[in-house]
From Swiss-Prot:
Coiled coil spans: 648-810
Compositional bias segments (type: Low complexity): 149-178, 282-299, 957-977
GO cellular component terms attached to this protein's record: cytoplasm
Keywords: Coiled coil, Cytoplasm, Stress response
Biased amino acid composition, Polar residues: 24-38
Full protein name: Stress response protein NST1
Role according to the record: May act as a negative regulator of salt tolerance.
Residue stretches of biased makeup (Acidic residues): 564-616
Superkingdom as given in the UniProt entry: Eukaryota
PANTHER family the UniProt entry points to: LD36051P, STRESS RESPONSE PROTEIN NST1-RELATED
Species annotation: Debaryomyces hansenii (strain ATCC 36239 / CBS 767 / BCRC 21394 / JCM 1990 / NBRC 0083 / IGC 2968) (Yeast)
Subcellular locations according to the entry: Cytoplasm
Length: 1179
């Protein structure tokens, strides 16, 4: 027996799986040592000896639905299986057999599940499960035999004391016989034996089973159908779960019947319950301790417990019957019902209180305790009836026996015997003896089970059996017998094959078949030898009430025989008590040996031919039961396999569903991650869109701002254009006013011309007078000529240069005009020296009259004035009427006049080689569509024009005739910067008028004078006396600086042009400025001074500059050009005459001076006529 059964484990040592206890037997320790030794070997031997320890055991789970315990103890069963027990509850000392069937250990819930599974099957599947065939049944027998032999082998190996091995078989007639097989090996029951004897024995058993199956198949099937109709598929689960016992419905039906009968009997014999209990309480040495009243109270207590059990059964059966047992009694004793007496082991006080308390303490379950109470109560009732049967009259025997049968038929007795756990009772040494007694009475289960089928004849046989029992245990004999002996006799008499079948699942029958085949002859001889002997004092087996005749009477044994039987039983039970500690299996073997001995004794005393027939009948009954058990096991195995297959399929399906669910969850997580990623991408995209939208809004705002700024600029430019338009309109309005003013002046001029013509007519008369004075004037001019020699030498070189380019085909009128001018100057000089001027020739006086004949009747200048447009000022053109040189004496205050520009040369001589005159041959009139080129130097007021492009506001044609000047060398030329008025003192050689488009010279203006100087027909009125020789006229001190800057600017422009730095023929203003400043080596020169000097048209450098402006009026580019023109050589053949000979008096000079000043005043009053100096009148 293993150590796990003898040494219980203290559960309090282990908490929540903190420690795991491994419990091994001796064989396991040896295996551990062997495995340790194997590890110490070399590596090449490890693979060979690696699996020498324990063989591979297939893992099976008795209850796969139970959760694996966290707090557990791992054990090893005797057969090597691993047992895992939970520590939540105290572990039972008894280890469950691993070979136990799943149906025996199944809970109610599992059985319900199996029933539900059976009901869920269709009819074809049910028929397939309950199909009976020979091969399946024989396979179950073989497998069972192998399993039992293997289990016995392990038990024998684990047994340390090692008792002698014997072959025990179930005895016929309910007794056992110890048959020692001569020559048989000690391990004949060991399935591991491979000897020829054991093989022949196994083959013999199988052959005998096959013969029994073939010969008695119909009888077996009929018996199976008697127990349960296996064709009733709906009722089969009850057969499978309940074995061949009665089903729950049959139990309930019989319970209700028996309870009703029991209640009637109890009411009828209520007075009998108050008597002294009939059970024998023969306490050695203390037989008088319990009086009648105490025993009566105990009996009442037993009856109350039985009634309580019946009431519970009635409640379960849903019957409305209630216990109307209304007798009242009170227990006055204070004795504890759970008390335990310290009796001697041989002195067992077995009254019902004591046994009930022991059973309750062992089982700790209400149901099991109640069943134990019922068992003991019914035993007491049986003993009581047996005692009463010997004391009462013979007339009441039938009634008493009837009550005993009712007690035996009580279903509570059956249930109590069915549910008693003798193994648990054996584990406790104090209850071990009582457990053996109750276990020997286990055959009552079969008796009670078969009583409901008994007919009248069998009931009569049972009555005879009870009578014989009453004779054996008579009152005379029971007083001398102790209580233990009586219990032993009862327990030995109630042993049967059903006990072996129920306890060992038919294993005892297999052993019986082995002994039966070997000892049949020996037993027959033994029966024949003892047949003639006198039968000993023995009783008939409990099955005799169903098989024996009513005439069989058992003689009453004498006291000597009873004492001998008592001694033998006491000796046997002493041996049993000593062997209880060796384990369950050894105790069973001792019991079987005891049964065999008793069987031999019974056979020696009671052997007869009738017993042989009875034994054969009982053997067939056991065979039927054995095959019924095997059939039920077959059905159970099939149903178990089908249920396991269904569970496997369900679990596989559940696993697949869980895997699919896990896969779906995984996919769902992946999809969730993908959705999160998509969401993140969408969020990022939305953020990018938001940023893009914000950027677009900023761009739109920026564009809006730019558009707004552009609109503002556009509005500003529109405003500027509007202002320009207004200024243009204002200029046009001013131009219109000037045109009107010019018309008015033209009318006045016409009036003056008319007056002048009248004066000319008068002057004709005077010329005749002056002819006489010509000679005198010539002389005077010669003298002046000598005085001017020095002055002429200074300008001779310049005149020689200009003379080369001068056209020698000048007309005679131009020479006369030059001569006239020299005569006028001589006359002026003569007047200064008080020299009489000669008379002007008549030819000169007659010339101015020709243009008047050609004058048209209509003035065309008005149309040109209306069509003329304002042009930008050009520094290379002169758009204003030129003012010819006049004598400083005519304008004595000209240098200090604020109306004159500040560009008059301070030097006392002419800078240009043409003596201050500029010949600009390519300048159109101010009313043409060409740009105006400004002369860098205007001719002196007192000097006639030499160029052929002299300005004439009434003539757009150009004349190739130039005027030659014979100015005095001792006079300073005072040019005007911007004004270009023609010489008002025109000589007779140039008599062209305003309406003469074919004139040879353009120097006639609207103020053009007549050739007759003496007529004083000029714009400025009469002439004034000439200043003395050498008198200086005020000039501009900055004229030389402007000339230097213009010359440097022109050189810089030429440098940029040669180095290909020009842009479309023009130079950038800043680059030109930097280059000019480098040339001048003047770092203090500013851009404003540079531009002002370049705009200075009164400079004598002879260079012109064109400017290009941007939209804001800033100079961006400048173009430079040269305007130097050679001067005309002087004509010295003009006679020097006195001013007086020309008939010019002071009045005439004063009138001319007044007219010139008025004209300059008009020009100065116009604010738009000047830009960076004095601008032209129509610019």
């Amino acid at each position: 027996m293993s150590e796990t059964q003898s040494d219980p484990i203290d559960v309090s040592k282990f908490k929540n799986g903190d420690d795991v206890h491994f419990d091994y037997n001796s064989t396991t320790n040896d295996q551990t040592i062997n495995s340790t030794n194997v590890q110490k070997k070399k590596k090449k031997k490890k693979s060979k000896n690696k699996h020498k320890g324990s063989p591979n055991v297939e893992a099976t789970l008795n209850d796969p639905d139970v959760e694996y315990p966290t707090s557990r103890v791992i054990k090893q069963a005797p057969n090597g299986d691993v047992i895992i027990e939970s520590l939540d509850e105290p572990s039972d000392a008894h280890t469950k057999s691993v070979t136990a069937n799943i149906w025996d250990n199944a809970t109610l819930e599992e059985q319900e599940n199996l029933k539900a599974f059976w009901e869920s099957l269709d009819e074809a599947q049910k028929i397939e499960l309950v199909k009976i065939d020979k091969k399946s049944i024989m396979d179950i027998f073989k497998n069972e035999s192998k399993t039992v032999n293997t289990s016995n082998n392990h038990q024998n190996n684990s047994n340390t004391q090692g008792g002698s091995t014997s072959t025990s078989g179930g005895a016929l007639n309910g007794s056992s016989t110890n048959v020692n097989i001569p020559g048989a090996p000690s391990n004949s029951s060991n399935g591991a034996c491979t000897c020829s004897y054991c093989g022949r024995k196994n083959n013999f058993i199988e052959d005998e089973l096959e013969n029994i199956y073939d010969n008695h198949f119909d009888d077996i099937i009929d018996f199976i159908h008697e127990v349960r109709d296996i064709n009733d598929l709906n009722a089969l689960p009850g057969l499978l779960f309940g074995g061949f016992h009665m089903l729950e419905e049959e139990h309930k039906l019989q319970k209700r019947q028996q309870k009703y009968k029991y209640k009637q009997e109890r009411d009828a014999h209520h007075d009998h319950h108050n008597h002294e209990p009939g059970h024998i309480c023969s306490d050695t040495g203390s037989s008088g301790d319990y009086d009648g009243s105490t025993q009566q109270d105990q009996q009442h207590q037993y009856e109350h417990e039985i009634e309580h059990a019946f009431q519970e059964d009635e409640h379960e059966d849903e019957c409305g019957h209630k216990n109307d047992h209304s007798h009242s009694h009170s227990h006055s004793h204070t004795e504890n019902h759970n008390h335990s007496h310290s009796y001697d082991p041989n002195h067992n006080h077995s009254h019902s209180h004591f046994q009930y308390d022991q059973i309750e303490e062992l089982n700790n379950e209400d149901e099991l305790s109640q069943e134990a109470v019922l068992q003991k109560s019914l035993d007491d009732e049986l003993n009581k009836e047996l005692g009463d049967e010997s004391n009462n009259n013979q007339s009441s025997i039938a009634t008493k026996e009837q009550r005993v049968f009712h007690k035996l038929l009580d279903p509570k007795l059956f249930e109590a015997l069915e549910n008693l756990d003798f193994e648990k009772m054996k584990d406790t040494p104090a209850n071990n003896h009582s457990a053996h007694i109750l276990e020997k009475a286990g055959s009552l289960r079969d008796i009670i089970r078969d009583l409901h089928k008994a007919d009248k004849v069998e009931l009569e046989k049972g009555m005879a059996f009870l009578q014989n029992m009453g004779k054996i245990f008579s009152s005379d004999m029971s007083n001398a017998m102790n209580h233990d002996t009586l219990n032993d006799q009862i327990s030995n008499g109630l042993s049967s094959f059903a006990e072996d079948l129920l306890k060992n699942d038919g294993n005892s029958f297999i052993d019986m078949m082995e002994s039966l085949s070997e000892s049949r002859t020996a037993r027959e001889d033994l029966l024949k030898e003892k047949f003639d002997k006198e039968p000993s004092a023995a009783w008939i087996d409990e099955d005799d009430h169903t098989k024996s005749d009513t005439d069989i009477s058992i003689p009453k044994p004498d006291l000597h025989q009873v004492q001998e039987l008592e001694e033998e039983l006491n000796d046997e039970y002493d041996e049993v008590d000593e062997d209880d500690d060796e384990g369950e299996e050894e105790g069973e073997e001792e019991e079987e040996e005891l049964d065999d001995e008793e069987f031999e004794e019974d056979e020696e005393e009671d052997a007869s031919d009738t017993e042989s027939e009875i034994s054969e009948e009982e053997k067939m009954q056991e065979i039927r039961r054995l095959f019924l058990i095997q059939v039920i096991k077959l059905f159970q195995e099939r149903l178990k396999n089908a249920y396991k297959e269904k569970l496997s399929q369900d679990r596989t399906r559940t696993l697949i569903e869980e895997l699919e669910a896990e896969e779906n969850a995984k996919k769902e997580r992946e999809m969730k991650k993908l959705r999160q990623k998509e969401k993140a991408k969408e969020k990022k995209r939305l953020q990018q869109l938001a940023k893009e939208e914000e950027r677009r809004k900023k761009e739109e705002e920026q564009k809006a701002k730019e558009e707004e700024l552009k609109q503002k600029q556009e509005a500003l430019r529109a405003e500027q254009r509007r202002k320009k338009e207004e200024a243009k309109q204002k200029r046009e309005e001013e131009k219109r006013k000037r045109i009107e003013e010019l018309k008015r002046k033209e009318l006045e001029h016409q009036k003056r011309l008319e007056a002048q013509r009248k004066k000319e007519e008068e002057t004709k008369k005077l010329k005749d007078e002056k002819k006489k004075k010509i000679e005198e004037e010539r002389k005077q001019k010669e003298e002046e000529k000598r005085q001017k020699e020095l002055q002429k030498k200074l300008v001779e070189e310049e005149r020689s240069k200009s003379a080369k380019k001068q056209d020698h085909k000048e007309t005679g009128s131009s020479e006369d005009i030059s001569q006239l001018s020299r005569d006028l100057e001589n006359a002026r000089l003569g007047q200064n020296f008080n020299i009489p001027s000669p008379v002007v020739p008549d030819t000169l006086l007659a010339q101015p009259q020709e243009p008047r004949v050609k004058s048209p009747t209509k003035n065309h200048i008005l149309d040109q004035l209306y069509l003329a447009k304002p042009r930008s000022l050009s520094n290379s053109t002169n758009s204003t009427p030129q003012i010819n040189n006049v004598t400083p004496g005519y304008i004595p205050d000209l240098s200090s006049n604020s109306m004159l520009p500040s560009v008059l040369s301070p030097s006392g001589h002419n800078i240009l080689p043409n003596n201050g005159n500029v010949n600009n041959q390519a300048v159109p009139s101010p009313w043409s569509s060409q740009a105006f080129n400004a002369n860098t130097q205007a001719p002196p007021v007192y000097q006639p024009q030499l160029s052929s492009n002299a300005f004439s506001p009434f003539n757009s044609s150009l004349s190739q005739n130039s005027l030659s000047s014979n100015a005095n060398e001792n006079l300073n030329t005072n040019p005007l910067n911007t004004t270009g008025f023609n010489e008002p003192f025109a000589t007779a050689a140039q008599p062209s008028s305003v309406w003469n488009p074919g004139a040879t010279s353009r120097n006639n203006s609207i103020w053009s004078n007549s050739p007759n100087v003496a007529s004083n027909s000029t714009l400025w009125g009469n002439s004034v006396p000439a200043p003395p020789v050498g008198a200086a006229v005020g000039g501009n001190p900055n004229s030389l600086d402007s000339d230097l800057i213009q010359a440097a600017a022109y050189q810089a422009f030429q440098f940029l042009q040669n180095s290909n730095q020009l842009e479309f023929g023009v130079a950038p203003s800043l680059k030109l400025f930097q280059t000019a400043k480098t040339i001048l080596s003047n770092q203090g020169l500013t851009l404003n001074q540079f531009l002002t000097s370049c705009r200075n048209t009164g400079s004598l450098s002879g260079y012109g500059f064109d400017f290009i402006y941007d939209d804001f009026g800033t100079v961006t580019h400048i173009k430079a050009s040269s305007t130097n023109i050679p001067q005309q050589p002087p004509h010295n053949n003009v006679n020097t005459q006195s001013i007086n000979s020309l008939g010019l008096g002071n009045a005439a000079v004063n009138d001319n001076e007044s007219s010139l000043l008025n004209t300059l005043s008009d020009i100065n009053n116009n604010p738009n006529s000047f830009s960076n100096g004095v601008r032209g009148l129509w610019n």
